[in-house]
Amino acid sequence: MLIGYPASGKSTYSSELAKETNSIILNRDTIGGTLKDLVKLINKDKNYILDNTNLSIKTRKIFIDKANELNIEINAIYIKSNIEDCMIRCMNRMYQKHSKIYFDGENDLSPVVLFKSRKEFEEPSLDEGFKEIKIINAHKLEFNNFNNKCVFLDIDGTLRKTDHLINKYPIKKEEVELLFDKDKMKTTLNKYVNDGYMLYGVSNQSGIGKNILSVDDVIDCMNETKRLLDIEFPISFCSHNSFPIKCYCRKPQSGLFLEAIYKYEINPFLSIMVGDRTEDKTSAKRLNMKYMTPNDFFI
């Protein structure tokens, strides 16, 4: 029995294991039906790999009971991962299949499904009836085939001064003000560009979801920011509400970064995230990027 979150790599592992052990894979996603329907397919004369999430004691019990009924051994293989890495793998799978990341999870798993699975998960125990439990750490997605490097820039509180604003972000271009002296900021950014980095903005703009400002208002403010800096670079932003998180694009989710990584063949290990908030630091950690605060970056 395989156990693990969605997008933890179970199906890839089960395919390899099936070849090695001459086993039959039972997966409700491919076969259809209910767990009880899968149980009916099990007999004593063959080896089976139960390839579903099998997250809870309750969902595992029906198969353990069947094994006991047939007097056969049942072992568990727990593919250990965290939800954040599973989300990155899910978005990678999405991009490989569709050449696009659907930030709401359309055509694949939504973030809501993954968050729910974390709540449902119960770590497997021998007390459930397994003869053996093997733990395998899930493979962490890397981007070693990409060679370009990037400075990812948060916008509000990093490039723009916002503490004095009512909403803590500008709602019209007249409110846009650079965080530091223009020459200081431009010199620093150009230094990185000359060192071979591209610049890419990533911003949470939940004011759109709250109907405080429009997409056009956000674009106007972003364009004004670049005009004041006198530097051109792409900026992506998430328009969804801050809570509850139902998308892959709101930082610290990795969607905006992955979109840029695939498009520009960026290696995050060679890149830098500059931001002023915890979600910026967390975003960097999830993708193995160096993190810097605005004060450290614009020295």
Predicted regions and their residues:
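Conserved phosphate-donor/acceptor-positioning beta-strand/loop module used by diverse small-molecule
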Residues: L70-C90
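Active-site neighborhood of HAD-like aspartate-dependent phosphohydrolases
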Residues: N145-M198
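Conserved substrate/cofactor phosphate-moiety recognition/catalytic segment
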Residues: Y5-K61
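Conserved nucleotide-binding/hydrolysis micro-motifs of P-loop NTPases
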Residues: I31, K80-C86, S206-I208
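Substrate-recognition element of Asp-dependent hydrolases with the DxDx(T/V) motif
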Residues: M185-M222, P234-N241
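Conserved GTP-binding G-domain of TRAFAC-class P-loop NTPases and closely related GTPase folds
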Residues: I3, S8, E16, E84-K149, ...
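A short, structured active-site edge motif that brings together acidic residues
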Residues: Y5, I77-I83, L229-K246
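Asp-based, Mg2+/Mn2+-dependent phosphohydrolase catalytic module
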Residues: F143-V151, I219, N223-I231, K246-M273, ...
